[in-house]
């Protein structure tokens, strides 16, 4: 019995479903017997209603004799599929008096259930088994315990509930992939590890559990890294000056692992744990058990400086380096996720995207006086990879000595975003839309702009905050589902035409205005027959649609492609509410309280100097200083606002015996002077910060002039 090579079988159709697809997870193994010119999908053969396995496993195809297969194909050729209306429907619903027949792929399409056990029964969409819950106390979405995507806890074909754990819900696709990988020996409830009850219910609901060993058991040294204890602090603000990986047993800097997953950790001091015996759960596990009531009973360890925030905000931690596998149908469930109580925080989403960043570093040579062109050259370099960690070195153009000095990545990204906001690629005052710049289009700058925005967000840069709601909605919902408004029109002449048309009070006035603007309306294809005054509204809608959306269609598509870098656009479309806050709105104004909590003390503090520091922040907020909160943050970090993904490393304060403050933007460190009086402290701080920022601006202007 010669079997064709796998590559050859792809061109042959299954004798039952007539499909060429070779997809083992969906249709089972595709096998071809050259001797009898026969190709079948395993599931198509197994689920056919008129055939039985009369031979041994090695006989025929999986124990199904060739003559029996021929008879079944002949029987099915007389039956019409009730889905695709073609002959060859070999599978029938087993419900009494139900005469529906269908192909296996068609049955999957119509959400039929195939039971891979017993008599291998098949049920159509009207008679398929369902899961029944006596009462539904789930008012909020719950996560699938495999992929962690949020789902509505209502049993359906695509959503299944564990029979042994009331809070365990799954996507059907997630369960099927899990079953194929785990096999009959390891497929069990992800919460309680029950095997018997769980497998019986899943078989009843049409999950195929193959009789084989788990895939990881067949792989040498699989999951070897799990044999190592996890030792890293993942809380949002680690207070250990030795770093997140530091672990000192029997001290406050000992790493405590999550009691649920063991794949996330915290220093005892960073989560206010008094002893190692205290329980602690990571953010992901705490969110899963919240609705079960266990979360409310557990002792809450709130992160420092987290007053007046919601329950999910106060528990925001830096995600551990484990990425949940996305289910195949996850994108279609985004709307369900948006209605969830656990709306994702944008900083957490960006931190997740940041897991793509590798340890390998790429150094960018940036000329601060020509930030755009030097950034463009760096990002277009064939050796540049967006997933590499970025290191910045500042250089001076036409410097014969070739000198360079270390630069702040966040300062560079902040300057780049400022330039982008004021560039000719966008138009508008505060809320901006894409402009139509033929030269920029020719040079592919819209793509580069989108790419820069994506890189900035993932690598810890500032939030743009200048998108109009129209541009944002086009990115999320598509231009065809977005209606521009008058504020989106930055061209004064076009805006005046729209205003005149919209304020016309009679049909005669409206026709007169259209005659005056005839050439323009004809050029943009918006001429229409006017019969009533209400026709002006459709005309205005057409003009707005052309000027704001259709006119810039090509730049928009290019910009959109750039935003796909590192998966940013997909995240924006999945969590529009979260990203709207940073793309369409400027960050909140800084205050003395925010800066005081932002900077942590990493060295032995001088109590007097720290008191002066807090008094100075309050004086700046009250307008009693020549500097601003933004000036202080720029001086220390290079950024005028807190990036959505947070600072790395966390901004810190040092008290040194120096006369003037020193800002280290590469390390986000501010050294404050130790002085005898507060007056001297404020004068030295004001003088240094004000003049340092002024000199930096003058240097940039000087280089630009040359």
Curated annotation (Swiss-Prot):
It comes from Homo sapiens. This is G2/M phase-specific E3 ubiquitin-protein ligase. GO terms for molecular function: ubiquitin-protein transferase activity; zinc ion binding. Its main location: nucleus. Pathway: Protein modification; protein ubiquitination. It is an enzyme of class 2 (transferase). It holds the Pfam family HECT. It comes from the Eukaryota. Its EC number is 2.3.2.26. A zinc finger (PHD-type) spans 79-128, 143-193, 237-286. Predominantly expressed in brain, liver, kidney, testes and ovary. SMART domains: HECTc, PHD. InterPro entries: EPHD (IPR034732), HECT_dom (IPR000569), Hect_E3_ubiquitin_ligase (IPR035983), PHD-type_Zinc_Finger (IPR051188), PHF7/G2E3_ePHD (IPR042013), PHF7/G2E3_PHD (IPR042012), Zinc_finger_PHD-type_CS (IPR019786), Znf_FYVE_PHD (IPR011011).
